[in-house]
Amino acid sequence: MVPAELFARVEFPDHKILAQTKDFHDSLTKPPGSLGKLEQIGCFISACQGQIPPRPLNNSKIVVFAGDHGVATKGVSAYPSSVSLQMAENITNGGAAINVIARTTGTSVRLIDTSLDHEAWGDERVSRSCGSIDVEDAMTQEQVERALEIGKRIADQEVDAGADILIPGDLGIGNTTTAAALVGTFTLAEPVVVVGRGTGIDDEAWKLKVSAIRDAMFRVRDLRQDPIAIARKISSPDLAAMAAFIAQAAVRRTPVLLDGVVVTAAALLANKLAPGARRWFIAGHRSTEPAHSVALDALALDPILEFGMYLGEGSGAATALPMVKIAVDLMNDMSTFSSAGVDGPLNASSEAPEQNTE
């Protein structure tokens, strides 16, 4: 399988609409550019939808991809792998941070268990955990193809159900190690540059994490032009499914609000699977994980928030969602200078007042 067999060509947001949005924003009752990034976000959503003003975002959806990671047995996390399944149940029961944020922002949460370490099977399952990426492949070829198919299918389901913006989230002990390995591989960054503290590891665990990431990156050193092979060897079922979900959202012309390092690592993979997918991304926030800034730079994304968050689950992106909605609502609900009877700015070509030089 090659990416072109799985994903259709990504079309870019409407550049003509994007060019027209500046004039539209400048007609609103405010000095040009005075709403800063809110103007940029609103213009982006207009281009994604192909209309000015954009439709209000009334059907956002958070999809959390959950899976365990074999590399977690190497001492790279402060928590045991059993926490993954326990937290998945917490999300299902509505008690996690992402549930609270989702309720506050009027967003629904869907949990996808691709590879948590328990006996279960279903349409969204790939495996029970996955290989330890420092010494073995994360998945077989059959498993990676299944993970990609699952992620693509879920994106289609959500878009077909009317989602107007998608927020992927992550859950799984050890997933920041996998994410850092992917970021290092795609950006050519050194392991020590992309390794953070994850769940709060000490110095010894940090060294183990660096070692695991170094070994994983070495295993794919000759495969940088083969994203599916990279996914098979050093990602995981949950990250591969998430990458396919993000890629297919772009194919379906649906903006994706990115969360932290794990989601953004999957977004790097998505942009390899479906070139140009990054044109449909908004960075919700910047996490404290070093690899996240490296990945954001590689995707040329400027995050909305910098709150020092690093939880995952889609929490940072979901927290930024109200800013995106506000950006859209401003374009819909603000008066223009003409409709409000407010004088606009002086014509730029008008003669400037004389300066008093005395």
UniProtKB/Swiss-Prot annotation:
InterPro entries: Nict_dMeBzImd_PRibTrfase (IPR003200), Nict_dMeBzImd_PRibTrfase_bact (IPR017846), Nict_dMeBzImd_PRibTrfase_N (IPR023195), Nict_dMeBzImd_PRibTrfase_sf (IPR036087). Keywords: Cobalamin biosynthesis, Glycosyltransferase, Transferase. Its EC number is 2.4.2.21. The keyword Transferase applies. It holds the Pfam family DBI_PRT. Pathway: Nucleoside biosynthesis; alpha-ribazole biosynthesis; alpha-ribazole from 5,6-dimethylbenzimidazole: step 1/2. Catalyzes the synthesis of alpha-ribazole-5'-phosphate from nicotinate mononucleotide (NAMN) and 5,6-dimethylbenzimidazole (DMB). This is Nicotinate-nucleotide--dimethylbenzimidazole phosphoribosyltransferase. The lineage of its organism: Bacteria, Bacillati, Actinomycetota, Actinomycetes, Mycobacteriales.
